[in-house]
Amino acid sequence: ITARTIGSFVLPYFKVCEKNGDAHFFDPSQISDGTLRILGILLALYHTPHPSLMVVEEPEQPVNPALLALLSDACNEASERTQLLITSHSPYLVDLFDPEKIRVVTMQNGETRVAPIRRSQREAVKEHLLSLEQIMSSEGLLPEDA
């Protein structure tokens, strides 16, 4: 990624190199919204100094599902040095993460409650009876009882 100044604006340009050494430059208007979103998230995940907390809302929007595995790998790696809070309604994305690291957020009596996934659901995933994607698509992820 490079930057070019045009008037009073600084615009990012993306350099893509082929195996033969040829380089091509693309401005943001030539790149899909999903690719730009993934690049932005990856830049934030690998930014130094590392922030103590990073929040990403619905990273799956509007991203090609094939790229979500790459994103989850990067998030898992970054979580070793930065606390990550990722919100998602995507069963496919949720399925790419460790059930022990996932929290369910609910509203009860006007209060927000954050809890681990219900033990029975975590055990079903651990025993390979169901995937998180299947659970989320059927009954939904349920919070552990207090």
Model segments located where?
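Residue-level detector of alpha-helix boundary/anchor positions
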Residues: T48-P51, A74
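Short strand-connecting beta-turns/loops that link adjacent beta-strands
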Residues: I6, K19, H50, P99, ...
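The start of beta-strands in P-loop NTPase/AAA+ ATPase cores
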Residues: H24, S52-L53
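C-terminal lobe/lid and adjacent interdomain/linker elements of RecA-like ASCE P-loop ATPase modules
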Residues: A69-A146
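Generic structural "secondary-structure junction" signal
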Residues: D33, H47, D95-P99
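Catalytic Walker B motif of ABC-type/P-loop ATPase nucleotide-binding domains
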Residues: M54-E58
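Conserved ABC ATPase signature
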Residues: T2-Y46, P59-A66
